[in-house]
C-alpha cells in the first residue's frame, strides 16, 4: 500500500513539475526568453497578396507565442509591411478602434506580447532604422497566437518580435517596400 501511494505521489509530482516547466519555459522573467507556447496547424485559403505576405499552407505547423521579448529603450524587432486598408492583406479592421486605416497613415500592429491585451492601443512608438526615426500609432495586434483563417488573411501567426507597419512608415524611414522585412529598434514614446 505504501509503495502504491509513493508511486502515485511521484507521478503527481512529475506531472506538476512537467506542466510548470512547460508554462515557465514560454517566458522566463529576467532572462527575456520567449518561446513558442504551441503550434497551429496550417490551413490554406484566399490569401490577399498585395504586400507579398506569407500565406498558410495546409498541414504545415506554425509556432504560436503569447509573449514577446522585453521592451527596452532600443527593443530589437523585425519591421514588416502591412496594409490596414479594407480588402487588403491586413485582414479585418484594426483591433484598437475597429476601423480601417489609409496606407498614408503612420500606423502599426505589434506582436501579441507587445500589444499587451490592447494596453498599447493609441500609443505612439518610436521606430528607428538606418539612422532614421519616426513615430507611429499602435492600432492593431499582429496576432502571434492565431492565424490561417479569414480574419487573418490566411496568414500564419506573427513571430513574437514583429512591428507590422503601414507603407507610410516604410516611406518615412526611407525603406524599400519591396524588401518587405527590415531589422529595426523601437521604444515607447
Predicted regions and their residues:
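Secreted/periplasmic proteins
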Residues: 2-189
